[in-house]
A protein has these predicted regions:
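Substrate-recognition/cap helix-loop segment adjacent to the acidic, metal-dependent catalytic center
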Residues: 237-244, 249-275, 414
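Short glycine-rich phosphate-binding loop at a beta-alpha junction
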Residues: 136, 248, 392-399, 521-524
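Short, acidic loop-to-helix structural element flanking the phosphoryl-transfer center
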Residues: 118, 186-245
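Conserved phosphoryl-transfer catalytic core
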Residues: 150-185, 333-338, 441-459
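Conserved Lys-Pro-Asp/Glu-containing loop-to-beta segment of HAD-superfamily phosphomonoesterases
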Residues: 282-308
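Acidic, divalent-metal-coordinating active-site segment for phosphoryl/phosphodiester hydrolysis
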Residues: 306-321
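Long, contiguous domain-sized segments
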Residues: 364, 372, 379, 430-431, ...
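Asp-based phosphoryl-transfer active-site loop
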Residues: 128-148
Length: 702
């Protein structure tokens, strides 16, 4: 076995693939020999070298292999030879034949994700565990969760504190090498944190003690209880069972004592720790130690997330087991694959915890948590940075898209003046009829062509009488008579303006009060053309002569699939409009994949809704006019509930890692992009919902 292990270093590609077969032959030979544990260690050494040769040396192979294993965890545990065969095929494809790598496309569950990872309730799980005398709990990814999709992502944070670039790679390599050294010297893979940081210190120049202290404190600070397992744990304790903690880990026992106490896991009998006992779950000997401690006649059960260490090995040593799926592996395919490393990792971990470790939630709430929370939080930070850089005196959040944004913004940034402003596309078009008559005609006339509208309906929405334009009330607007109606409106703009006299007075009074004492204003809207900001700027300065500077921010802009895709390009170019997520010059992949005709605008706007009716415009004597009803009021509240819960969860982590608060527009939009990548997902979520179609003026079923 030793000779076989040593020759791997000099093998070429084809020889390596052959070794994959020899590995399994060696395995079956070993298990029949008497010195079982010594041979297991030798086999693990060969396996590690083979893994490095087949998988670790090619990033593309490693990426696809790890994705495959995580997606087929059950199959991998039962038949690892299939996974190794897949690794061989990947090497042939990417190392020998050099095929181009294809991106693994994210996929989205079509419906409610929550509660689907682990089928049993907390009561059912506790009852099953209580069938034994001694109940053993795994720690990480079972009792305790890290706020990262991958455990190694914690090393990003430690590296930042230590001031060492690429520390994640360095730290992982040092741990791997420490295990090799331990195996060569003591025939064991169980290492301590000190063993690891002895190598880290040698390779980075930092003090080993300082590095260990930093990792110890960072891990302790960031780790949190799995709420589902905390409930199970307390129920088992309440039944009077002997509870023990069993873990393969390099941290000392005092770390686990502090970690478990901090997160509410008290009352256990003992911690069985691999690095202090010299044996682990990975080779099965830790289970034998437990039985020697409590007696072989007792009934034992262990719950954990690793099919090999926690399930297969435990069963081989007489334990009953409960498999608790690793939530981050289970949900890997359903999270965005194109977010930045740290923020993407934290985002995925929080979503996985919320959906799989807590009580099931509605699909609407889930949509708000998954897609809206990070978008609202990131957008608020973008708004704040923009306000500071532009010396803004006051921020105007447009109704209704600005409702949840203002609520969160005011909570996070109380030092900035804000106002929730009743402003809508309809009101803006009327008040700017003489400034932008083409837009007025487009909104009220052209967009209703061929939709079975009568002239009476159209001009009533304009608060005018069609008879004043010599048009028959019952006549339907068609392509055939469109030009006649357009010209009738263009030729009567002064008359239209005079009809809106009371509206102008009310609007001027309203905005003078809002803008009093402010010279630099920032408007906030969801999207798309930016006409709300453009028209407010024109109204305040060209009609009301207020002499104020108006800049607008948008979550997203018009895309190339719209007829007026370049409506505001000059405003975007000169900085009068600032996009957050995408525009023709920002994050082009999102710009090109956002399709309004596939209802992407509607789904996006639902993340920014408000639980009150639409603003219709200004009446006389300062009157504000609203629609008679609010569509989707409960739906909006449920979405906001999910968004606020995500924000609370994220800010809890952000309090310990401050720099993850600066969320890029790309990261903020990525979960929504993943959601719309499955055409059935959102259409199913919103099957019974309606939206206010501003183009047609009607409420339409989504």
């Amino acid at each position: 076995m030793k000779e076989f292990s040593e020759i791997l270093n000099g093998l070429d590609n084809l020889q390596i693939y052959s070794c994959a077969v020899l590995y399994f032959i060696a395995f079956y030979d070993i298990i029949n020999e008497k010195s079982y544990y010594r041979k297991v260690v030798q086999l693990m050494s060969v396996k590690l070298k083979l893994y490095n040769k087949l998988i670790n040396r090619n990033r593309t192979v490693k990426h696809h292999y790890e994705h495959y294993v995580a997606s087929h965890e059950s199959l991998h545990a039962k038949a690892p030879v299939i996974s190794w065969g897949f690794a061989v095929l990947l090497n042939i494809k990417y190392s020998l034949l050099r095929f181009p790598d294809k991106e693994i496309k994210p996929k989205q569950k079509a419906g409610n994700e929550s509660g689907t990872s682990f089928r049993m309730t907390a009561d059912e799980t506790a009852d099953l565990l209580c069938t034994a005398d001694v109940v053993s709990f795994d720690v990480f990814d079972t009792l305790i969760l890290r706020p990262f999709a991958s455990p190694a992502d914690l090393f990003y944070i430690i590296g930042e504190k230590l001031g060492i670039p690429d520390f994640r790679t360095v730290r992982k390599k040092c741990e791997s090498d420490a295990r090799k050294i331990k195996q060569q010297k003591e025939n064991s893979y169980e290492v301590t944190l000190g063993d690891i940081y002895e190598l880290v210190a040698h390779r980075t120049g930092i003090s080993a003690e300082y590095g260990m202290k930093t990792e110890y404190e960072t891990e302790l600070s960031l780790c949190r209880a799995n709420p589902f397992m905390l409930e199970v744990y307390k129920k088992v304790l309440a039944k009077g069972k002997t509870v023990i903690i069993t873990t393969d880990m390099y941290m000392p026992e005092e770390f686990f004592t502090a970690l478990l106490h901090k997160n509410g896991f008290d009352g256990y009998d003992r911690i069985f720790l691999s690095c202090e006992s010299g044996c682990g779950k990975s080779d099965g000997r830790l289970y034998e130690m437990i039985k020697e401690q409590y007696g072989k006649e007792k009934r034992y059960i262990h719950i954990g997330d690793n099919r090999h260490s926690d399930i297969s090995n435990a069963e081989k040593h007489g334990f009953k087991t409960v498999y608790y799926p690793n939530i981050n592996n289970f949900a890997r395919d359903f999270r965005p694959h194109d977010m930045s490393y740290i923020i993407g990792s934290v985002y995925s971990a929080l979503v996985n915890e919320r959906l799989y470790c807590r009580k099931p939630c509605s699909a609407i709430y889930e949509y708000g948590y998954k897609c809206g929370g990070i978008l609202v939080l990131g957008y608020c930070n973008f708004i704040y940075k923009t306000a500071k850089s532009k010396n803004i005196d006051k921020i105007l959040f447009f109704a209704r898209d600005g409702y949840i944004l203002k609520k969160i913004f005011d909570r996070l940034y109380p030092d900035v003046k804000t106002e929730y402003v009743y402003w809508s596309r309809t009101a803006a078009a009327k008040l700017c009829a003489d400034i932008f008559p083409f837009d007025y005609v487009r909104r009220f006339i052209e967009q209703k062509t061929g939709r079975n509208y009568t002239f009476e309906e159209i001009f009533s929405a304009m608060e005018l009488s069609c008879k004043d334009f010599s048009l028959m009330p019952g006549e339907i607007l068609t392509n055939g008579n469109l030009h006649r109606v357009q010209e009738a409106v263009y030729n009567n703009i002064p008359h239209i303006t005079s009809c809106y006299a009371d509206m102008y007075k009310s609007a001027e009074m309203y905005f003078k009060k809002i803008t009093e004492g402010s010279k630099n204003l920032l408007t906030v809207d969801c999207g798309w053309a930016g006409s709300g900001s453009i028209m407010l700027d024109a109204l305040l300065n060209r009609k009301f002569c207020m002499n104020v500077n108006v800049i607008g921010v948008l979550a997203g802009t018009n895309t190339k699939y719209q007829l007026d895709s370049d409506f505001s390009e000059t405003y975007l170019a000169d900085g009068k409009l600032l996009p957050y997520c995408f525009s023709s010059a920002l994050n082009r992949r999102y710009y090109e994949n956002h399709h309004p005709d596939m209802k992407h605008n509607i789904y996006f706007e639902l993340l920014f809704g408000a639980p009150h009716p639409s603003f219709l415009g200004f009446g006389s004597d300062g009157e504000l006019k609203f629609d008679v009803e609010c569509e989707n009021e409960q739906l909006v509240k449920d979405i906001h509930s999910g968004e606020e819960d995500f924000i609370n969860d994220y800010l809890e982590v952000c309090g310990k890692i401050s720099y993850i608060g600066d969320i890029s527009g790309s990261d903020a939009y990525a979960p929504f992009a993943a959601a719309i990548s499955d055409g059935k997902y959102l259409s199913g979520v919103f099957a019974d919902s309606v939206f206010d179609d501003t183009a047609s003026g009607r409420k339409t079923k989504i």
